[in-house]
């Protein structure tokens, strides 16, 4: 909450928020860098080591300070559809809350360790996109879907793993 309150102290930020439409996006820096739900922090700067608890607190603050509540179907859920008349549906995704533990992201078969989007969110996206009559359908993702983001020399941080067979989080 303190970080959100700090931003609101800036008059320019408040003016922008009052004048510019915004779709708030949830990612890792609301909690800790590159987090996943089952993570236990080894960083001594944190008195709370459970990332799941930190993420729950961050999620609550996010929804208290960011313009999301109007579209939420379920309290605390980040993924949602934002419609702008008959022309545009924006599908806002959450690539943090449903992901498996960070790994080398090179698994050959789909399994619990390759989760990225989460089965429920994927089913929701498919259903909502099929039911959408909007001319334009935009997926707003907090991480690049098809861009390679290296995590060391051999692993990749997001969903894409480069050329070759489907591996790791690409299964989602």
Residue ranges of model-derived segments:
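Metal-dependent phosphoester/phosphodiester hydrolase catalytic core
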Residues: 1-172
């Amino acid at each position: 909450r303190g970080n959100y309150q700090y931003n609101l102290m800036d008059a320019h930020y408040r003016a922008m928020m009052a004048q510019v439409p915004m779709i708030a996006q949830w990612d890792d820096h609301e909690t800790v860098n590159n987090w996943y739900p089952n993570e236990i922090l080894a960083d001594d700067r944190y008195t709370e080591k459970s990332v799941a608890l930190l993420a729950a607190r961050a999620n609550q603050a996010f929804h208290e300070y960011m313009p999301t509540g109007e579209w939420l179907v379920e309290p605390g859920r980040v993924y949602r559809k934002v419609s702008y008349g008959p022309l545009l549906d924006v599908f806002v995704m959450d690539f943090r809350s449903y992901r498996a533990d960070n790994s080398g992201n090179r698994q050959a078969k789909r399994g619990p360790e390759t989760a990225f989007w989460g089965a429920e969110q994927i089913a929701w996206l498919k259903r909502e996109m099929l039911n959408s009559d909007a001319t334009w359908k935009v997926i707003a993702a907090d991480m690049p879907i098809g861009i390679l983001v290296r995590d060391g020399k051999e692993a990749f941080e997001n969903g894409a793993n480069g050329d070759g067979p489907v591996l790791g989080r690409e299964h989602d």
